[in-house]
């Protein structure tokens, strides 16, 4: 028995912001962005387009390639830091409804940049444990809406879009996902976070504030390089 990635699909917003345009907004240059990040451009969702909209578009493409009908899905997992709604309902439930995948399990997963990897691991494990057939794994973000466009250390890095994968449990041996390694380092949580209202209690009433991304770029970079090297060797 194995779990395979049967197909993938993407949603790339039409609006494209090249480095040359970004260099007119903040104190940076096209060459600096390219040399430090390797990014040439980022795509931005149009006004009114939600995370679930991008997720659904990517999902439809993946399902069509796989030849799997939405009603055949047993599970939908959406990894996102920018859900349609804070708290609930889950964006995965909205995606389920828009696809017509009635009856499937559906939930969101939040793990930042590693969200899709976590979602793929969780979904494949659930397919094996529950002896289910098909799952839809989606990573979707509308990060441009929480980026501080005056902060060059973060606005150069993030954009919008979605990717989806249909994964399936098969009886054939010698194929499929081989292994995965997951981990976290909670001590660095505040090196990359959303600036929000300070609250004494989780749901204490407070004045609304649009959250913005804050990042200690050097620490995040050092951690990523060190950790990826260790994980690859494992």
Language-model-detected regions and their locations in the chain:
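Generic recognition of short, well-ordered alpha-helical segments
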Residues: 57, 89-90, 149
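Phosphate/pyrophosphate-binding loops at sites that engage ATP/ADP/AMP, CoA/4′-phosphopantetheine
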Residues: 58-74, 231-234
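Condensing-enzyme catalytic core mediating Claisen C-C bond formation in acyl metabolism
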Residues: 1-47, 151-226, 230-233
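Structural signature of cysteine-dependent C-C bond-forming condensing enzymes
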Residues: 65-74, 99-105, 127-141, 172
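Conserved catalytic cysteine-centered active-site region
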Residues: 32-53, 81-135
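Flexible, glycine-rich active-site loops centered on histidine and acidic residues
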Residues: 126-162
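Acidic, glycine-rich active-site loops and adjacent beta-strand->loop/helix elements
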Residues: 10-11, 79-84, 111-116, 139-144, ...
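Short beta-strand segments
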Residues: 6, 79, 110, 135-141, ...
């Amino acid at each position: 028995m194995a779990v395979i990635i049967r197909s993938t699909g993407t949603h790339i917003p039409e609006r494209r912001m090249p480095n040359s345009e970004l260099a007119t907004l903040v104190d940076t240059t096209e060459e600096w962005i390219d040399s430090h990040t390797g990014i040439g451009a980022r795509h931005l969702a149009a006004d009114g387009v939600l995370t679930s909209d991008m997720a659904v578009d990517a999902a439809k493409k993946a399902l069509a390639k796989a030849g799997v009908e939405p009603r055949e899905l047993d599970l939908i997992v959406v990894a996102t830091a920018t859900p349609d709604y804070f708290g609930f309902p889950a964006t995965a439930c909205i995606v389920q409804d828009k696809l017509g995948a009635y009856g499937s399990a559906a939930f969101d997963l939040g793990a930042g940049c590693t969200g899709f990897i976590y979602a793929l691991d969780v979904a494949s494990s659930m397919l094996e444990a529950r002896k289910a057939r098909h799952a839809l794994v989606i990573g979707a973000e509308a990060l441009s809406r929480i980026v501080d466009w005056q902060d060059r250390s973060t606005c150069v890095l993030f954009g919008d879009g979605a990717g989806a994968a249909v994964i399936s449990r098969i009886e054939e041996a010698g194929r499929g996902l081989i292994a995965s390694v997951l981990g976290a380092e909670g001590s660095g949580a505040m090196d990359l976070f959303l600036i929000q209202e300070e609250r004494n209690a989780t749901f204490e009433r407070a004045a609304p504030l649009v959250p913005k991304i804050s990042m200690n770029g050097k620490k995040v970079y050092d951690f990523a390089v060190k950790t990826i090297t260790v994980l690859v060797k494992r």
